[in-house]
Amino acid sequence: VTPFRTARPAAATTVAVCAALATLTAAAPAPAAPQQGARPLPAVTPRAETAALYDDEQGGNANADDPAIWRNPDDPDRSLVIATAKEGGLRVYGLDARLVQSLPAPAAPGPDDAPGRFNNVDLVHGLRLAPDRTTNSAAGRTADLAVTTDRGHDRLRIHRIDPSRPGGPLTDVTDPAAPRVFSAGQDEVNEQATAYGLATWTDRRSGRSYALASRRNRTSIALLELLPTRSGTVTYRKVRTLDLPAAFRLPDGTAWTPCGDPGELPQVEGMVVDPADGTLFAGQEDVGIWRMPADLRGKPVLVDRVREYGVPGTYDEESEECAPGKDPGFGGTRVSADVEGLALLPERNGDRYLLASSQGDDTFAAYARRTGRENRAAPVYAGGFRVTAASATLDGSEACDGAAVLNEPLGSRYPGGLLVVQDGDATPAPEGREATGFKFVDLRKVRSALGLARAAEAAE
């Protein structure tokens, strides 16, 4: 992923957050002084890894990206990890990291069009579907769903989760008439400024379920309400959209836009909603982490910056890369571009921790959201960690994209919960092949590395 991006004006959407640049400076956190002699971050090791995926013709152009963890309430040992593989479709794994089901991405609609490309995935629990006509049941069924952004077609894809289903737990229940998320037509889809990042959210007040989708190479985020149809499928409607800024006023009074390929804006990918108060956290890859109401009605606040924030860059057409200039020192100290996967770790005492993948330096940062604090309070940095090799054949996570965490007992393998992280450079790999995959980490190791286990014991 290119570390710097250029900006050009985007089409207006329902909510715009591109007001006076000076306002952005006030909303962003003050630059932190570099830490001298800081201790190395603690390391945790994975317990298991999935088989490598290969982004080439032989491997079906499969490229690991984003995971989600589904807990089987009847048999936690049979819980599942559902993960995107881009043009390779969806993969479903057991807790042993072995493949349970593989679903292909949809084919290209025409010879000159892009095929389906599953980018990000998240879960919805207990959505009520229409009555099942195949069984003549009059009662509506509730179902857990895996919702995916299909970047290739600019649509959401929705799969029902049923662990007892012969042939695999996932069934596609996407309404064939489901609309495109951002694009007006196929020509616009082919430009690939399409649905990209994803987070799901069920409003506790109304009971309605939503997906929030970001737009590739743009700053837009769309709120989409998930709607069951009479035929038992699921569609969605766009409620509103919001545009994050693409240009920023720095503390020295100068303006800055992240450098990137011509015509591209600084995009968002990693997103997660805290269901306790309906707060959306969104990672603008080359900028930092934003906080905003998940209904997209309020003003976004930049709560942490990437280290590269404010660094000027010049795009080189020959190399197709950005050459960075002198660092003015306005960036943060916790995450390096790209800021990628975001996940929420809830504790038993009600505290919540936002985990962020710092792709630029192969680390993960944790931010505390304390019980009883106002929603407007910024998350507080609580530590970080690395996922490193457990052995010569079980490597760690590098250039991590997506991540998912579940702090609930998952049977005998993960009684203290599970963290799943993407590995952007799975090794060992055959020479000349790009290998990716997912690492499964015992959550107790992560909580110990962050000091959460000791804090929980002290509170008891």
Predicted segments — roles?
Residues 4, 33-460:
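Sequence/structural signature of beta-propeller domains
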